[in-house]
Regions:
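Bacterial N-terminal signal peptides that target proteins for export
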Residues: 2-11
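Hydrophobic helical h-region of N-terminal Sec-dependent signal peptides
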Residues: 12-17
Length: 196
């Protein structure tokens, strides 16, 4: 919930700035393309908040496409927005490596790119809005170490392994438990952000 509030705050600031830019009567429409990675309830809520905020500003249009966890589909969605000539791209990359080239392409064509929740493998984007996933992983590792009193076997369940939140959380987790030689990571499994 706190994460969603952070995103809402930054998206509100973004739309306020866009609203100021679109105040003139003859101002062209400002087109925003949103390339979501999935269709889960958290993403639906984010999409609803983006659309709700856009309603407050004349001259701003938003089109949202979801890749349904498919890297190829998301790359097609971003190409679609590039070809359409959007003024801003908001992207939550399904997986970092497959999405890096297409995000870099948009950025190099002068389209501002805001990455939300998930990064790519380069710095070719305008802004990132999201959590410090390394710190989250480190905090979990310290919690596990404390709970196990510095000794035991651990199985790590990660999010989608190619996504930056999962990669950064794993790095933070490993950094924390590496301080405890009697804690062993005996297995790691990709849970793909699913609860089951």
């Amino acid at each position: 919930m706190i994460e969603a509030m952070k995103y809402t705050k930054w998206i509100t600031v973004l739309f306020c700035l866009l609203g100021l830019a679109a105040c003139r009567q003859d101002a062209p429409r400002f087109r925003i393309g949103v390339a979501q990675c999935s269709d889960d309830s958290w993403r639906h809520k984010m999409n609803d908040e983006i659309l709700r905020e856009a309603m407050f500003y004349d001259g701003v249009s938003v089109e949202i496409r979801s890749a349904a966890d498919d890297n190829r589909k998301q790359a097609e969605d971003v190409h679609y927005f590039i070809d359409k000539g959007v003024d801003l791209l908001i992207i939550s990359a399904n997986e970092a490596a497959p999405m890096t080239p297409i995000v870099e392409e948009a950025y190099q064509k002068g389209i501002p790119v805001i990455l939300v929740d998930r990064k790519i493998l380069s710095d070719k984007y305008t802004a990132y809005i999201g959590a410090d996933n390394y710190e989250i992983g480190r905090a979990v590792g310290n919690y596990i170490a404390s709970s196990l009193k510095g000794k035991g076997n651990v199985v790590e369940l990660t999010g989608l392994s190619g996504s930056t939140p999962a990669m950064e959380r794993h790095q933070g987790f490993m950094a924390a438990i590496s301080n405890y030689p009697d804690i062993k990571l005996i297995d790691k499994a990709d849970a793909a952000w699913e609860r089951e």
